[in-house]
A protein has these predicted regions:
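C-terminal helical cap(s) of enzyme catalytic domains, especially alpha/beta-barrels
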Residues: 97, 175-212
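N-terminal glycine-rich anion-binding loop in soluble enzyme alpha/beta folds
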Residues: 1-23
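Short catalytic-loop micro-motif centered on adjacent basic/acidic residues
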Residues: 32-33, 56-58, 82-85, 139-142, ...
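Alpha-helix-loop-beta-strand connector modules within alpha/beta enzyme cores
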Residues: 39-60, 99-109, 151-167, 204-212
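N-terminal active-site wall of soluble small-molecule enzyme domains
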Residues: 17-18, 22-24, 33-77, 116, ...
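Active-site beta-loop-alpha junctions enriched in small/polar residues
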Residues: 8-12, 34-38, 60-62, 88, ...
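Conserved anion-binding
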Residues: 2-5, 63-147, 159
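A C-terminal functional module that forms or caps the active site or interfaces directly
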Residues: 137, 144-191
Length: 212
C-alpha cells in the first residue's frame, strides 16, 4: 500500500534536511518544503529532494496573478509534484497558479489548523472551497486536528485530494484524519525532531494503514 504520509522538513540546515530526506523518502508519499528550506539553500533544494521523493512546495502563494504565475513556473521548472496556494486572494490569483502549474498539482488553502485561523480564513471556508473548485484546484488543505471539518470538506469536494496539516505537534492524530476522509496527512516536527525519524515514519504509516 502506498504511503499517505507527507513529511514537512522545515529545517534550517541543508545537510540535516537532505540526510532525513534520504532516509525516509522511499517510505512517504511526499516531502513538503516550505520557505525556510528555500531561504537557506535556494530553489535547487527542490530538485535535490526530488531525488528521494515527490516534493510539495508549501509556498502558500498569495500575490497578484502575474507574480503567482512567476512563482509557479519556477517551482514547476525545479521538478515539484505539487504546490500549495492561498485562495483568499481571489479567483484570478488562484487561477494564475493553476494555469501556470502544468502537470503539477495545486492545493488550495481553505481552512487552517492554528488558533488565528478562526479570525478570517475558517469563517470563509465554504466560499473559498467553492471558488477553488470552480478554478480547478486538484485538492485542498484541511485541518488535521479537526476531523469533523475534514469530513465536511470531503463531502463538499468529492474526487478532490484532501491534505491535512495539524497532526502531531498541533494535536491531531494521523489515523483520525484518515478516518475522517483525508487522503494525505502532513507531519513535520513529530518526525524531524524525533530521535529516530525512520522509526517515527514507520509508526505513522502503520497508524494510517490501520485506519484505511
Amino acid at each position: 500500500m502506498e504511503s499517505k504520509l507527507v513529511v514537512a522538513l522545515d529545517l534550517m540546515k541543508e545537510s540535516d534536511l537532505l540526510g532525513i530526506a534520504g532516509k525516509i523518502g522511499s517510505q512517504v508519499f511526499a516531502i513538503k518544503l516550505n520557505w525556510p528550506a528555500i531561504l537557506v539553500s535556494g530553489s535547487r533544494i527542490i530538485r535535490d529532494v526530488s531525488r528521494y521523493s515527490r516534493v510539495i512546495c508549501d509556498f502558500k502563494v498569495a500575490d497578484i496573478p502575474n507574480t503567482n504565475s512567476l512563482i509557479t513556473e519556477k517551482v514547476l521548472e525545479m521538478g515539484a509534484w505539487g504546490i500549495i496556494s492561498h485562495s483568499f486572494t481571489g479567483h484570478d490569483s488562484l487561477g494564475a497558479v493553476i494555469e501556470s502549474a502544468g502537470d503539477m498539482r495545486v492545493f488550495s488553502v481553505v481552512s487552517m489548523s492554528h488558533p488565528g485561523s478562526a479570525e478570517f480564513i475558517n469563517p470563509n471556508t465554504d466560499r473559498l472551497l467553492e471558488m477553488s473548485i470552480r478554478a480547478g484546484a486538484a485538492g485542498f488543505i484541511a485541518p488535521g486536528n479537526n476531523p469533523a471539518e475534514i469530513s465536511r470538506i470531503k463531502k463538499m469536494a468529492p474526487g478532490k485530494i484532501i491534505m491535512t496539516p495539524g497532526v502531531g505537534a498541533q494535536g491531531g492524530k494521523a489515523g483520525d484524519a484518515i478516518h475522517a476522509g483525508a487522503d494525505l496527512v502532513i507531519v513535520g516536527r513529530s518526525v524531524y525532531a524525533s530521535h529516530d525519524p525512520v522509526e517515527q515514519v514507520e509508526n505513522l504509516n502503520r497508524e494510517i494503514n490501520s485506519s484505511v
